[in-house]
């Protein structure tokens, strides 16, 4: 129930959220009694923006078969995980010299010392030693690999607004 996010001690009993980026305003609100509905007030200028949400639990190791399972069965994952699985399902874009995020990809691959591959619906981490299944890699590295793959497949681009819940979780220093 979305209303549980509203502090019960607020005099109005409403949550009001406003985001302004590049003179584009997005506002929404909901009451402490709301179950699933929010009141959305937005500029049409937001229609050209793409949003992606990275939930606290990583999706990389759960990916294989997740979309099929979630479409046919009730599962205990909310829609944000299903949306992320659909975003991860897309293949990588053709390599382009004019991609503004190319330097970010190169930096991530250099610092992480791996590349990310998807083969037959399963993710792999490719190092100099070979390919390793994603579920065998530390959770923090899987989160970073997800971000890297979302850049490679175009789901994160120069116009994407990234919401990353608990980005610091499991990103322990080596």
Predicted regions and their residues:
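Phosphate-coordinating catalytic segments in nucleotide- and nucleic-acid-processing enzymes
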Residues: 1-159
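Walker B motif beta-strand of ABC-family P-loop ATPases
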Residues: 161-163
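Walker B catalytic acidic pair
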Residues: 165-167
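Conserved D-loop-proximal element of ABC-family nucleotide-binding domains
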Residues: 172-173
